[in-house]
Structure formats: C-alpha cells, structure tokens
Amino acid sequence: MAFANFRRILRLSTFEKRKSREYEHVRRDLDPNEVWEIVGELGDGAFGKVYKAKNKETGALAAAKVIETNSEEELEDYIVEIEILATCDHPYIVKLLGAYYYDGKLWIMIEFCPGGAVDAIMLELDRGLTEPQIQVVCRQMLEALTFLHGKKIIHRDLKAGNVLMTLEGDIRLADFGVSAKNLKTLQKRDSFIGTPYWMAPEVVMCETMKDTPYDYKADIWSLGITLIEMAQIEPPHHELNPMRVLLKIAKSDPPTLLSPSKWSAEFRDFLKTALDKNPETRPSAAQLLEHPFVSSVTSNKALRELVAEAKAEVMEEIEDGRDEGDEEDAVEAASPLENHTRDSSEVSQLSIDADKLLKESPFTPPPPSQPQDGANGPSEPPGHGALPATSPLDVAPGNENGQAVPVPLRKFRPVSMGARIQVSEEKQAADQGGDLSPAASRSQKASQSRPNSSALETLRSELTNGSLELPTPGAQSLSKRDSDCGSVSTSGSTDFGTSLSADMSVNKESGSLSIKDSRLHNKTLKRTRKFVVDGVEVSITTSKIISEDEKKDEEMRFLRRQELRELRLLQKEEHRNQTQLSSKHELQLEQMHKRFEQEINAKKKFFDIELENLERQQKQQVEKMEQDHAVRRREEAKRIRLEQERDYAKFQEQLKLMKKEVKNEVEKLPRQQRKESMKQKMEEHTQKKQLLDRDFLAKQKEDLELAMKRITADNRREICDKERECLTRKQELLRDREAALWEMEEHHLQERHQLVKQQLKDQYFLQRHELLRKHEKEREQMQRYNQRMIEQLKVRQQQEKARLPKIQRSEGKTRMAMYKKSLHINGGGSAAEQREKIKQFSQQEEKRQKAERLQQQQKHENQMRDMLAQCESNMSELQQLQNEKCHLLIEHETQKLKALDESHNQNLKEWRDKLRPRKKALEEDLNQKKREQEMFFKMNEESECANPTSPNKVTKFFPYSSADAA
C-alpha cells in the first residue's frame, strides 16, 4: 500500500514520454569507439566501469567512465556533472575531454592523472602526508575552490579520494557527481548528500530537517576534514559507523589532530579556523588563501617527491618469521618477489562517483601466511596484524662529484590495524606476552608522520618487558575504513568490537589481554623503493609483519565498498525521486496559478460582458426614449396645431359674426349716417380684430410652448429615472463582481494552502519512504556484518580446536621427556616405581589436557555468547538510532504542518483585514458616482431654466412661417 502511494505521489497526470533533449556538451551522433581506444580497465564504479582510453588521433590518455542509461531521466542525472566539468577550466580541476551518449551508454572522458588519488598514495606508502605536502595540496585545493565558488558551484564531496595527482606534482579536483550548480550567489541547498565522515554539520542536519540549508561554506569544512585525513590517513571518527558519526559531527566539538604536538601551530590554527561549526563565521576559500599556513607556498616540490615515491620501483620479499625448531612446520625460505613498477594511477585514478577501483590497486596484498602449528595458540584475528618497520635509506651517487649524497631517514606514518605495532630496523617486536593499554595503542596509530627513535625504543622495550596493554575488544576497530568509500549519504564502516585474538591469552581475573608469540604464524614483508628526485636517487626500505589478516582486511574493504555502492545507488534513486517530486510540485503550483488566473480572468470577463451589455442596453433604451420623445413631440405638436387651427378658424368665424353684427347695427342707422358710421365702425372692428387675433395667437403659442415643455420635462424625468436605474443596476453588478472576486481569492487561498499542505505531506512521505529503505539496507548490512563476525569466530575457534591436540601432543612429548630426564637425573626408585610414576604423570597429563580442552570449549562458548550478545547489541543500537531519526522526522513534519496551518490562518486573517477597507473604498466610489450623476442632472435642469433658447424649446419644433403669422 505504501509503495502504491509512493508511486502515486511521483506520478504526474500530464506526464508524457519525454523527447530526447539535446545537451550542449554531449554528442549523440558519434560512436566513442571510433575516437577512443580502450587500453585497459581501471575499475568498477557504482554506476559503471571505468576504463583507461587512448585517443586514436592524438594519443592522449583519458579515464573513460561508461554508464548504462536506459532513459532520458537517468541521463539527466549526469548532465550537471558534465556541465560543471565542461565549464570549469582551471589548472587544479580535472578536465572534461568529451562526453558521448551512444547505444544506451553514456561515456564521460576525463583527464587521466597518472599519480592517482591521494588516499591511494597513502595506502600504497602505508603512511600519511608530511606537513609540506599537505601545505601544497591545501593551497591548490583552496585555489580550485575559490574558482568553483566564484562560479556558484558547491563541490559537496571533498576528500582525499577525490584529489588526483599528476606527475608534475599538481592536484586535480575530481568527482562532481554530487555537486550543485546554483543560479544565484546566495542560493542555498538542503540536499543530504556527500560522504558522512567529511560532511559539514549543516549538511548533516539536512537529513531530517530542511529548514537550515547550507551554502559553499560546507566545502570549507570538508577541506579541513580532508587535511586531517591526509595527516592521519583516516578522517576523524573513522572508527564509528555512519549513523553514529553523523550524530558525532552534529553534537560534538570540531575534530582536531590526534597528536597536535607533531604539527606546526599554523597547521593547527588553519584547522581550527576551517572547522568552525557556525557557517556564518567560517571563512571562505579566498580568505583562507591569506592564512600563514598556505600563503608561503611557492613550489610543489613536496608533491613531486610524493608522486615519485608512490610510483617508484618496488622490490618485495617475504621473510619467514617462524621458529626454526618447530618440528611439524616446514621451513619456508624467504623468496624475493619479482621486481615491478607500481602505477598508482591505476588505482582510484578516477574519483567520479567516488568508488575507488579494484582491479589495479596500488596496494597488492601479500599472500597470507598459512596457519601454522605453534606452541602458544592459534593465529591472530582480523585487524591484528603487525605494522611496517622502517629501515635506513640506501643512497646512490647523485651529485656532480660522484659522491654519495646523504639523505635523511624517511619517516613513515604506517597504518595501524588492531594490534599491529610499529618497529624499526626490521626487528619483530612481539617477543613476549604483555598487556597493551588503549592509550598506547592509539599512540601507535597512523597519525604520526615523523615518529622519533626514542618513541620506537620505548615501544620496543614495553613489548619486550610485557608492559604494553592491548585495547579491549569492544573498543577496537575491526578493519581500516575504506578510503574509497565514495559519495554516499551513509557509509559501511563500523565501530563494533571484534572477538579476542587467538594469539592472545585472557587473564580472567584482571580481564586484560596478553600477546602470545605470534612469530610462528607471521611473516615479514620487506619493500624497497627506488626513485629519483631532482637528480638524487633515493632508496627506501620498509618492513612490515604480515599475516593472514591482510587478506581479511582486503576482503573487509571490498565488502564495505560493495555496501557503500548499494547505499550510493539508494542515494541516487532518492535524489532522482526527490527531483521528480519537486518537478511535479512545481508543475502543480504552476498549473494551479494558471488555473487561478484563468478563473479570475473568466470571472472578470463575465462581469465585463454583463456591464457592457447593461451599458449597451441602457444606451439603446435612452436612444429609444429620445426617439419616442421626438415622435411624441411631433405628434403632440401636430395635434395641438390642428386644434389651434380649428380654434383659430372658429375664432375667425366669431370675428366675421362680429363684423356682420357691426354691419347690421350700421344698417339700422339713418342712411345719411350709415356711410360715416360704417367707416368708423369698420375701422374700430379692424383694430379690435387685429388685437384679438394677436392675443389669440399669442395664447396659442404660449399653450404650445407649455405643452412642449411639459413633454420635454416628462421625457427628461423618464431618462433620469432610467439613468438612475441603470446606474443602480451597474453598481449592483460591480458589487457582485467584486464579491465574486473576493470569494474566489479566499477560495484560492484555501486551495493553495491545501495543495501546499498535501505537497508537504508528499515530501515527508517520500523522505520517510527513502529513510526506511536506507534503514532496511543498513539493517541488512549490519546483519551481514554480524554474520561475518560469527563465521570468522567459528572458523577461528575451529582452527584453535584443531590446533590444540597438536600443541598438546608437542607439549606432552616435551613434558614427558623432561620428566623422564628428571627421573633419570634423580635416579631414585626402581624401574617399576619409575614406570608407575611415569604412568601417574601420563594420567595427570591426560587430565590436564582434558581440562584444557574443557577450558577451551568453555572459552569458545563464552566467546560465541559474547559475540551473539554484541551482535544483538549492535542491532539494538542501530534500531534505536533509526527509531530516533524516524521520530525526529515525524516530529519535524508535525511542526511543519502546524506552522503551515498557522501561516495560512495568519495570511487569511490579513487578507480579511485588508478586505474591509477594499469594501469601504468600493462603496465610497459608487456613492461618489451617484452624487456626480445627481449633480449632472441638477446642473442640466438649471441650465435649461437659464437658457430659454435651449434646443429643447418649442421653437426647435415649430418654426413659424409668414403664412402662420398671417
């Protein structure tokens, strides 16, 4: 069910099959086999094999990384690395010679560095770097980091395994497989990526918390850890497993050198400055270049000497260290191995993906010595071999006079593995048993670049006198950390204790261990290196006591490398899933914002259309009203004119009657008066007629004007009412529009919050899923580790059990011979008595041997019980750490969800608070428009009253002609 949910989270509804993209620095149309010739295999990385290739035209060498890529998505995982390599042209950064994608395989051609990686050189020489060598490496790394950080690139996986060497004594910073290329200078990252031992504290915190991202200052911390690694072969806390080392980095103080007195004050101060847990106060690479530790570096001679020594001709021979008097052991003569020249470039040449290479390792493990029948117990367990010894140098003539040039004794910092002890002058140190203290053991670790002779003499005397104590098994590391651990979020190195060595006896009262004589089972490997530095031929001879533990150490490193590859694959898949999920979330947000914008635009468009329709309807209605008004005025004017014409005709008839009456009155007068009276009366009638006619026409004109004004006023009132009605409807529409937009905004806020909340849940679901997968892989690796420990213990116990009868027979013969000799010397008693005494002694020996066998059986049972308890404790501790991490992730998810809800509620409250003034401003604007409309209507009415010649006057409709006037 969880896996189905996980697939659902990563599935996009709009995903289609991706088309092939064209990348600037990747060629798709060319078969790399036509350009490059494979001349050898360098190794097998986590994602593909690495070959040594030669350009067919120029003859240039390259390291070719060939990766199977089945899809465009997988190809995109490596594009960042290719782009970074292609854009970084710097003398201390490895160069990209080409990239090809052909026939489902990605070929990345990288500059070939013959010197190999620094960690491989340290393994080859069995010592760390000297301070002058560290200074040069540090200086060149800082210059490379300054260049990278200036291009907004974070390396994120700095360590000795990713620092390659050239024959000229320069470094090449490599492995950009987990690097980040930012778009902005101040951009930060929150990916939990890199190798645990070199991780900065702020990067460690990103495993479960993404709230504290990191920037390029994380590389400065990794640089400081890398310098400690170069000084001590191993990084700090290498004895811890990755789960615990992450907690150690996050909670403990910054690491320091194990033996500060062996190093200069400038080096210690540089480490203190670089290893600042606060990234804000941690200096940049450019600032560190001004530090006295590196500012005085002017030459790379120290690195040229280092590369020459690592690539020197090596003569190896094995000297048998067993007792010559061992009757049951065959004497093996020391046989010199064939001369060979080591090519350290064939080891860890390419640090891409940080998986160091297996097939051409610069450190060829010597053949393990077979377990021999010894008198003092079985062979040593893994991790308890002997340390190399140093011998004086052979100096060849190298000056102009042909005289021998005195060369000082080269000091070594050998690797300490368990109970290996550093000695000098090719002498084996463990002559007699003794107790070794943890402090003494730590003092002999490979952290001292220049051990003095007095310390060696003191150690030799302690071994001889049996006063040196061994560490307890629970505190002893099983094997060296694999320096080729690669770029993974976790590592397979462990800190769980090993069982007791078979070459050590247990003091059950004190609980201490004592070394038994292991010379019967160990051999001495002597190496002689010859190389030339500045015309001086130097010969260095080193000796190291070896045993079968060497092979077991190699097996342990190989198994750890396999485990780290598994974790690296998990991390790569996790990064791909995170990228897909982030892309999905970005697409969802983008689609949601587009949909929001479309919805808002659609809503605005709807209301805009409604407003437009309303305004158009209003305009049409007003135009129709005006047309109706004009028609009405014409009809009303026509009707009134007709009525006035009829009235005027009647008025004329009345005037005619009045004229007749005047005539009738005149005719009634005497004849002599008629003419004069008629003339007078007719003049009076004519004047009266004119006056009445003028008054009548004026009255008609006034009535017409009043009628027209009344009609115009009615029309204006109707239009004003219609305008008010339309404005009201328009404002209601605006209110509805704003209310719909506000409701949509609130809905969008809610929807966006729900989407972001779901995306956050998906993000944490993916984190939990990946964390559980990682935990499952860690438990699987822990189970395999525990099973290996149990199997090794069983094999060791079987060897002890098989060896004990031989030892008892040898001891029995010796004791019997000594007893018989003592009886013969004493000469007491008869032959029968001597036979009886011998018989009794034989019976006592049988009882003693039986008791030894029972004691051994009990010891084995106790060892197995302790081992099972230790394995169970290991699993419990791992489970507890994993549970704490899961609980922390769930707790952080709860806090993030709570903070997200609180932020949403706050945003919603702020939005609602801002909504009130928006509503108020809208109402004020609408009221202002109403007032402006009323003011406009009022001003129009006043102008009508003040302007009698207004177009709306009656004269507009009825111009009077001369006929009308007549």
From Swiss-Prot:
Comp. bias (Basic and acidic residues): 833-863
Entry superkingdom: Eukaryota
GO BP, sorted A to Z: protein autophosphorylation; regulation of lymphocyte migration
Enzyme Commission no: 2.7.11.1
Reactions this protein catalyses: L-seryl-[protein] + ATP = O-phospho-L-seryl-[protein] + ADP + H(+); L-threonyl-[protein] + ATP = O-phospho-L-threonyl-[protein] + ADP + H(+)
Renumbered residue ranges of the record's region Disordered: 318-411, 424-512, 666-688, 825-863, 941-966
Entry comment on modification after translation: Autophosphorylates following homodimerization, leading to activation of the protein.
Region (Activation segment) residue spans: 175-224
Mechanisms controlling activity: Inhibited by the pyrrole-indolinone inhibitor SU11274 (K00593): intercalates between the ATP-binding Lys-65 and alpha-C glutamate (Glu-81), resulting in a partial disordering of the lysine side chain. Also specifically inhibited by erlotinib. Slightly inhibited by gefitinib.
CDD domains named among the record's database cross-references: STKc_STK10
Membrane association type: Peripheral membrane protein
Compositional bias ranges of the Polar residues kind: 452-467, 486-512
Gene Ontology CC annotations of this record: plasma membrane
GO molecular function, one term: protein homodimerization activity
Main localization category: membrane
Biased composition (Acidic residues): 318-331
Residues that bear Phosphothreonine: T185
Ranges of biased composition (kind: Low complexity): 437-451
Binding site for ATP: L42, G43, D44, G45, A46, F47, G48, K49, V50, K65
Modified residues (Phosphoserine): S13, S20, S191, S437, S449, S453, S483, S512, S547
Subcellular location: Cell membrane
Coiled-coil regions listed in the entry: 571-945
Record's protein name: Serine/threonine-protein kinase 10
Organism encoding this protein: Bos taurus (Bovine)
Lineage: Eukaryota, Metazoa, Chordata, Craniata, Vertebrata
Gene name per UniProt: STK10
